[in-house]
Amino acid sequence: VTSELFPAAGLGSSAALSAAICAALMHREGDGDGELDLEHISHLAHIAEAEAQSGRASPTDTSTATLGGCVLVSDRREESAEWRWTRTLDTPEGERCWEIHSVSLPESVREAHLVVGSTGVHAPTSKMVAKVAGLLKRQPDRMDEIARIGDLSRAGAGALTAGDLVAIGRLMDEVHDLLAGLGVSCPELEQLVAAARPTSLGAKLTGAGGGGCMLALTTEPEATA
């Protein structure tokens, strides 16, 4: 297997591979003529991701790899997006439930670019997710920060569908700062984010953090890079 994505870098490479393998196996087992069941592929890929991450995995990457386009994952059904399906997972902390949506983007969003900066630091998702789970167990009041990230993400989805790039960038900055406060950033990520922000609308770590990559939203990709 070869990939142009950085591994263990928060870019969803393992989810893309899981979804592709599930789709290939389903195609092999089927008649090869009918359309593949995207929800079932996403379900199987999510289970595979969870098995590799100590029973904890968001369906965001596997749903995006399966559906393509822009995907919104929420703890509720969002009126501003097209609902696709519900995913549940039994985790060490109890059952989790997510609502998966597709989002239509306005043409104005095409004016912006995403610049990816790699730290070169490998950070297994399972390790970082377990770290945050441990923090929340020791300090339950930190769930307020998780809830705030959820609120900002919902606001970001609204800004995205409205094509408000400035608002999206501002929200990215705020979410990154909250994630850093939860201990999932690292010096290398902070250096990349600081370097990108002067020429971008916003920048944040991507994936579980601890290394991997950061994303910068910019209308000047050459300057940001």
Segment roles from a protein language model:
Residues 1-9, 36, 40, 44-47:
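Glycine- and acidic-rich phosphate- and metal-coordinating loops
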Residues 2, 172, 206-209:
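Short beta-strands and strand-loop turn motifs
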Residues 4, 50, 210:
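Residues that form or immediately flank small-molecule/cofactor binding pockets and catalytic motifs
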Residues 6-7, 175-178, 211:
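A short, flexible beta-alpha/helix-coil linker loop
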Residues 8-19, 56-68, 204, 209-211:
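FAD-binding core of FAD-dependent oxidoreductases
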Residues 11-33:
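DPxDG-like acidic metal-binding loop motif
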Residues 28-35, 43-56, 62-204, 215-225:
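C-terminal nucleotide
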